């Protein structure tokens, strides 16, 4: 099945483009946002960044961003990562194996 994806030369850019076209990109983003909010990750990250600013009011944006980015990526729950990867895989496989055409799949 994975060979089919590569044999059709589906580049990352093409996959993202097709995910946008099908609406799956927005759906995946919304689901990720919901899951991160539901598990308290967004609140945890907000509190973390506020704590940094409160302890060092002279911190520049770039340092705050780098610190927050590292903490953010490390603290995403594994269950959220696995669910997202599963959903992405399903979408990519759907793109690689489109449903038969409206003519009932008859090949000429």
Curated annotation (Swiss-Prot):
Q: Which GO terms describe its molecular function?
A: chromatin binding; transcription coactivator activity
Top-rank taxon of the source lineage equals: Eukaryota
What keywords tag this UniProt record?
A: Activator, Chromatin regulator, Cytoplasm, mRNA transport, Nucleus, Protein transport, Transcription, Transcription regulation, Translocation, Transport
Q: Where in the cell is it found?
A: Nucleus, Nucleoplasm; Cytoplasm, P-body
Q: Which biological process annotations from GO are given for this protein? A: poly(A)+ mRNA export from nucleus; positive regulation of transcription by RNA polymerase II; protein transport; regulation of transcription by RNA polymerase II; transcription elongation by RNA polymerase II; transcription initiation-coupled chromatin remodeling
Give GO cellular component annotations, separated by semicolons. DUBm complex; nuclear pore; nucleoplasm; P-body; SAGA complex; transcription export complex 2
- Family per similarity comment: Belongs to the ENY2 family.
What is its biological role?
Involved in mRNA export coupled transcription activation by association with both the TREX-2 and the SAGA complexes. SAGA acts as a general cofactor required for essentially all RNA polymerase II transcription. At the promoters, SAGA is required for transcription pre-initiation complex (PIC) recruitment.
Subunit info here reads: Component of the 1.8 MDa SAGA (Spt-Ada-Gcn5 acetyltransferase) complex, which is composed of 19 subunits tra1, spt7, taf5, ngg1/ada3, sgf73, spt20, spt8, taf12, taf6, hfi1/ada1, ubp8, gcn5, ada2, spt3, sgf29, taf10, taf9, sgf11 and sus1.
Please report the name of this protein according to its UniProt entry.
Answer: SAGA complex subunit Sus1
Organism encoding this protein: Schizosaccharomyces pombe (strain 972 / ATCC 24843)
Gene name, Swiss-Prot/TrEMBL? sus1
């Amino acid at each position: 099945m994975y060979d089919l994806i590569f044999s059709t030369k589906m580049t990352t850019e093409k996959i993202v483009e097709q995910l946008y076209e099908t609406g799956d990109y927005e759906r995946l983003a919304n689901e990720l946002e919901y899951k991160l909010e539901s598990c308290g990750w967004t609140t945890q990250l907000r509190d973390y960044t506020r704590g940094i600013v409160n302890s060092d009011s002279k911190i520049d944006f770039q340092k705050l961003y780098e610190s927050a980015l590292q903490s953010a990526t490390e603290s995403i729950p594994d269950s959220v990562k696995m669910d997202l990867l599963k959903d992405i895989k399903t979408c990519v496989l759907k793109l690689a194996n489109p449903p038969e055409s409206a003519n009932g799949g008859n090949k000429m």
